[in-house]
């Protein structure tokens, strides 16, 4: 709740981000981690080597003792490849309006291929198929750590290639029934059916699923005035009722020995109505004055996607490939708020209606050919069209205005840039050269030229052109088949978020109804300097990696001042100039074979992050918005094959103290306790799998401290300080799955 206050000094740090980062890396914690890693490496060299190729192959027999059900279960048993089998199996909405438009040739991290191919989809991709592929269909899994012109993706740290058996005819039907139980005694059912197999030259996969995503968030907030006296207390119950329904199919047809085609389709529906009950107690002047509000926000969301590709190989090994993807995401919600009085009567005070449609169309073609011994080149082009249509209606209670039926019976408020269409057409011709210098060294060089046109129409009309040259060099050196060094230099252009162009709702601040848009945005870009070292321990004991990289940003995007001439203080996303970021990642995934516990897999990671940017409001040097100091993650998985059981616990803990959001009239800082998940899984009754999951086992509070200022933050007039904490409680789920 806003009140007026007095002046208070804003803390300012002038310490160089680079010095802070180097200081963090040299802490005793990292000294200990490097010592442990060094001892591990020293001992492992005395053990026998496993081969002369950096690619690691895991045949189906490797996984037999763990009785996996899906391809994801198999991948989870490989050190360094863990992903929760109990994670959301429903569809996800990858919002093209927020960046990530187009497809490209791949990305960093671990990429998934199925039978050497990338699925031509974004929401329905190879990663989402892993929980749908029956383990009995998998012949072997390759972990590919090198680069090659034969691969379907480029630039990945490593690739997991799931290779399926080639049989004339086989089918399987996988089922899963689930029930989630929440801390407020609410329960929600879910489940999925997957029918897949091979018929002649056709591989097929059909899936239908329903995934509960119910959330009950309890929020408590205390605030104080500049003189440290009590201001108010707020308690909220925020409930979102959502179940995501997904229908999808993936088809792979081998037309001949030289040609093949793939097709996939997906439809997702995830209506997400929300209700809020809010109690506010005014504590000023030693008072105790309660008031009540309630909100009702019916929401709808659906997404569809189709994609396909065709590949033809010539007799000389050259390869031609063309693919297409089309998708659309529709979202709509209407937020209404009422004052609730002691006698049970209500009075509406807010109407906020938003609607958006995002469409994306992608076509990409390429030709790959060998040019010299050990060298290949791929050249081609990609065209991507993205369209956002959005509208926003705001109505408030007013004694003088004219009620409007379109605004919920309240007085209409003019919101600039509220009805807008944004369209981008982007072209990317590219050439990728891959050179296997010798059995231990490879280098991949890519040259991409991006040019695009962004047009905005509606409340404002604007059209601009952009062009960027994006080179990349990826060098890999296998010192041994186990130890690999990677050096990467690339220029990365971040695609603009279309939602930053237009006015939108503010779901993070009850005192602010809408966020302003900025129609003059430019894409920001950075140079990425990346060094990675990875060591795979002998005898499949595990993998340890260290990664350090630096980003040098140009035209970096943060909040900027867009206040109106009438004196209304406003901010929006905008370009602010140059900035830098440093990141250090240390990861490990190790079997406890040295303690005679080979079926216990321990995973851990430490991430340290620092950044430096000139704040556009205060002129001080600070970290990036919402980018903290890093995180520490730990977990283990224990398989007991003789009991056909496994269990595990994972912890995620961010390093608090610097996760801040600087805006034109407030400063927010987030912090929270470690977050724990656990699971128990066993197989019984003729290969039926039972899995119990507990999410947020300790009922963690995530907290935010917000300092609000009267007017512009540079005026340094403190209004209030808010201390908010929220929790969603422990969720327990049971999943029963099997195969027919």
Give names to the regions the model predicted.
Residues 49, 56, 72-122:
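Extracytoplasmic beta-strand/coil segments of soluble accessory domains associated
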Residues 71-74, 100-101, 112-115, 128-129, ...:
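N-terminal periplasmic accessory domains that precede
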Residues 118-145, 193:
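Short acidic/polar hinge/loop motifs at secondary-structure boundaries
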Residues 135-172, 739:
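A beta-strand signature from Gram-negative outer-membrane beta-barrel systems
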Residues 183-218, 229-276, 298-314, 473:
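Transmembrane beta-barrel wall of Gram-negative outer-membrane proteins
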Residues 321, 385-387, 484-490, 494, ...:
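Membrane-embedded beta-barrel scaffold of Gram-negative outer-membrane proteins
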Residues 549-552, 570-658:
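Gram-negative outer-membrane beta-barrel transporters
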Residues 655-658, 682-740:
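C-terminal beta-signal and adjacent terminal beta-strands/loops
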């Amino acid at each position: 709740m806003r009140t007026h206050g007095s002046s208070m000094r804003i803390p300012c740090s002038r310490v160089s981000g680079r010095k802070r980062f180097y200081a963090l890396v040299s802490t005793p914690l990292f000294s200990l981690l490097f010592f442990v890693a060094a001892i591990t490496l020293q001992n492992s060299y005395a053990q026998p080597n496993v081969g002369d190729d950096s690619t690691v192959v895991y045949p189906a027999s490797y996984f037999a003792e763990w009785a996996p059900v899906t391809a994801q279960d198999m991948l989870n048993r490989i050190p360094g490849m863990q992903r929760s089998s109990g994670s959301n199996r429903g569809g996800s909405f990858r919002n093209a309006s927020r960046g990530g438009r187009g497809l490209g040739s791949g990305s960093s991290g671990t990429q998934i291929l199925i039978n050497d191919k990338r699925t031509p989809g974004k929401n329905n991709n190879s990663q989402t198929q892993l929980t749908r592929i029956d383990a009995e269909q998998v012949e072997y899994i390759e972990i590919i750590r090198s680069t090659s012109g034969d691969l379907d993706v480029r630039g990945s740290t490593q690739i997991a290639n799931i290779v399926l058996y080639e049989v004339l005819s086989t089918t399987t039907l996988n089922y899963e029934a689930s029930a989630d139980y929440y801390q407020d005694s609410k329960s929600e059912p879910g489940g999925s059916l997957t029918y897949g197999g091979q018929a002649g030259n056709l591989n097929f996969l059909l899936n239908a699923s329903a995934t509960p995503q119910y959330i009950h968030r309890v929020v408590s907030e205390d605030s104080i005035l500049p003189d440290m006296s009590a201001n108010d207390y707020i308690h909220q119950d925020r409930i979102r009722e959502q179940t995501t329904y997904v229908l999808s199919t993936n088809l792979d047809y081998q037309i001949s020995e030289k040609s093949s085609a793939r097709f996939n389709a997906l439809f997702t529906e995830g209506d997400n109505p929300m209700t809020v009950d809010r109690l506010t107690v005014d504590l000023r002047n030693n008072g105790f004055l309660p008031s009540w509000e309630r909100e009702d926000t019916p929401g709808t969301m659906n997404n569809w996607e189709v994609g396909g590709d065709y590949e033809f190989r010539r007799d000389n090994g050259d390869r031609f490939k063309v693919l297409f993807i089309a998708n659309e995401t529709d979202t709509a919600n209407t937020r209404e708020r009422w004052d609730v009085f002691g006698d049970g009567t209500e009075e509406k005070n807010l109407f906020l209606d938003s609607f958006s449609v995002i469409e994306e169309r992608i076509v990409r073609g390429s030709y790959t050919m060998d040019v010299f011994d050990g060298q290949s080149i791929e050249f081609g082009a990609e065209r991507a069209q993205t369209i956002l249509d959005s509208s926003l209606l705001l109505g408030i209670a007013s004694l003088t205005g004219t009620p409007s039926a379109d605004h919920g019976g309240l007085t209409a408020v003019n919101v600039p840039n509220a009805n807008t269409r944004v369209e981008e057409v982007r072209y990317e011709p590219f050439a990728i050269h891959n050179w296997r210098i010798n059995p231990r060294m490879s280098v991949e060089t890519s040259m991409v030229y991006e040019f695009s046109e962004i047009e905005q129409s509606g409340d404002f009309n604007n059209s601009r052109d952009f062009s960027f040259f994006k080179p990349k060099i990826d060098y890999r050196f296998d010192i041994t088949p186990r130890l690999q060094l990677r050096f990467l230099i690339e220029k990365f252009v971040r695609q603009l978020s279309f939602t930053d162009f237009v006015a939108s709702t503010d779901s993070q601040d009850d005192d602010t109804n809408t966020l302003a848009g900025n129609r003059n945005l430019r894409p920001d870009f950075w140079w990425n300097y990346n060094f990675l070292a990875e060591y795979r321990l002998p005898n499949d004991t595990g993998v340890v990696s260290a990664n350090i990289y630096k980003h040098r940003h140009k035209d970096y995007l943060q909040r900027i001042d867009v206040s109106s001439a009438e004196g209304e203080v406003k901010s929006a996303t905008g370009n602010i100039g140059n900035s830098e970021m440093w990141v250090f990642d240390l990861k490990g995934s190790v079997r406890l074979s040295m303690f005679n516990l080979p079926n216990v897999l321990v995973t851990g990671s430490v991430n340290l992050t620092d950044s430096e940017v000139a704040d556009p409001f205060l002129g001080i040097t600070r970290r990036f918005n919402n980018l903290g100091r890093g995180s520490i993650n730990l977990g283990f998985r224990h398989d007991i094959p003789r009991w056909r059981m496994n269990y595990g616990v994972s912890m995620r803990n961010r390093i608090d103290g610097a996760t801040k959001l600087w805006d034109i009239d407030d400063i927010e800082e987030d912090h929270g306790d470690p977050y724990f998940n656990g699971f128990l899984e066993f197989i019984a009754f003729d290969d039926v799998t039972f899995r119990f999951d507990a999410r947020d086992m300790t009922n963690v509070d995530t907290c935010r401290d917000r300092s609000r200022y009267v007017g512009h933050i540079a005026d340094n007039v403190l209004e209030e300080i808010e201390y908010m904490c929220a929790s969603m409680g422990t969720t327990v789920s049971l999943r029963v799955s099997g195969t027919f």
